[in-house]
Each structure stands twice: as C-alpha cells, then as structure tokens.
C-alpha cells in the first residue's frame, strides 16, 4: 500500500470579491464589458468565473478557441462568446449551433466560413479584426490609404452569404506604455478611419471595440461601444 496522499498538494483560492471589484472598474466606463476568460480564465476557472461575471453584468465573453467556447456554453454561460483565435472554417455549423461569434482576420477566411455556413443552412455571426498597428493578425489598416482599403474589404465581407458582421475590433500594441501614447493614438486614428468609411457606406458594425485592459485605464477616448477586460480582471 502506498502512503502517498492522492489529494493535490497545492490549490488556488479565488477571491470573488476581488474579481467583482476588478470587473466594476470596466463597468464604470458605461460601455458594454467583454470579459476575456481564455486559458481557463488565466488559470482561475473559466466556467466558475464566467458564471459569476455573467451575474455581475458582463455583456460578452472572449476565449481563444472553439473548445473553450463550447466549455462555457455547456457550463451554462448564456451571454455572447467571441473566439479571438483561429477556428477551422469547416466548423461553421458547430459555431452556429452553440451560438458562438467568430473573429475573422481576412476576406478569404470570411468567404470560407460563409461557404460552409451556407452549405449547412446556418448563419454565423462574426467580428472582423483589423490590424491598425499591432502587425499580427487582421485586415491591414495602417495609414489612411490602407484603412480605406480595409473598409472596402469589410464591405465585401458584409455581402457574403452565410455570415453576419456583428462587430469590428482591433488590438492596441502599447497601450500600457505611456511613452508610446502617440502610437496608440495613431492606431486609434486608423481604426476610426475604417469606422467612418463604413458608416458612410451605411455599414457601421453593431459592436465596435478596441480597448484592452490598459486602454480601459488610460485611453477613455477609445472605449467605443464595448471594452475588453482581460488581465486586469485577475490582479
């Protein structure tokens, strides 16, 4: 017989009062609040935290991948869920089945999602990501000319059967660095150039968002319709 205690030797105790306090920082902006609970809510327990935050008034959740989104739905989360990362386009029907919103990074991906969704007889909600200066993923929109071209691309995405554009977002790369505020302002200008061009076409997305945790605290001008509260939820 082994004398080893099978119970875990370590555990984490989550202070839900602290989580509520941190959530309310974003809520005080007066905007919709998207809570980022990817990677098991940064190790804090995605379903447990998600259910709690939903009761506190969270409007939206974001995760990294399809399996994380399904875990939330099956755990009882009812608010909209946005997948920030890549999902193979063939899973369009599953995304629609679980009422999950998918981020799309380019026109080709949007076309493929639309094709699979139309073949399955479903409609998929998407948020279009634009690259205003992070230089990672999204439709290129750095500078006025590129931003106007991005608006034309998004106009074409609006017309793809099988998908509905519900939102548009970007990610600030250095919003947490005061010495780089000029760059964050440039990114936001690129975003608003795209947004204004779409609005002129009669295509303003329902939910526009750009502010990550740092921008919630430091850049109120960029709060738009919704803010994305990530790491500041947890510490």
Model regions and ranges:
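Active-site-proximal beta-alpha core segment in soluble small-molecule metabolic enzymes
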Residues: 3-6, 10-13, 18-21, 31-209, ...
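Active-site loop ensemble at the mouth of alpha/beta enzyme cores that anchors a bound cofactor
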Residues: 217-235
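Histidine/acidic residue-rich metal-binding segments in metalloenzymes
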Residues: 24
């Amino acid at each position: 017989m082994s004398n080893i205690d099978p119970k875990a030797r370590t555990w984490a105790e989550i202070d839900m009062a602290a989580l509520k306090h941190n959530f309310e920082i974003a809520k005080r902006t007066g905007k919709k609040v998207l809570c980022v609970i990817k990677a098991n809510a940064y190790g804090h327990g995605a379903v447990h935290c998600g259910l709690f935050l939903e009761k506190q008034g969270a409007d939206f959740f974001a995760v990294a991948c399809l399996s994380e989104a399904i875990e939330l739905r099956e755990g009882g989360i009812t608010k909209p869920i946005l997948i920030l990362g890549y999902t193979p386009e063939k899973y369009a029907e599953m995304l629609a089945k679980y009422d999950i919103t998918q981020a799309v990074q380019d026109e080709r991906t949007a076309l493929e999602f639309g094709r699979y969704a139309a073949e399955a007889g479903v409609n998929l909600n998407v948020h279009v990501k634009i690259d205003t200066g992070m230089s990672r993923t999204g439709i290129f929109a750095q500078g006025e000319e590129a931003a106007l071209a991005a608006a034309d691309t998004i106009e074409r995405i609006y017309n793809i059967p099988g998908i509905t554009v519900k939102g548009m977002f970007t990610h600030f790369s250095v919003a947490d660095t005061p010495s780089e505020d000029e760059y964050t302002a440039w990114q936001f200008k690129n975003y608003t150039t795209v947004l204004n061009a779409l609005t002129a076409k009669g295509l303003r997305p329902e939910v526009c968002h750009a502010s990550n945790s740092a921008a919630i605290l430091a850049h109120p001008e960029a709060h738009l319709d919704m803010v994305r509260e990530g790491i500041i939820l947890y510490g």
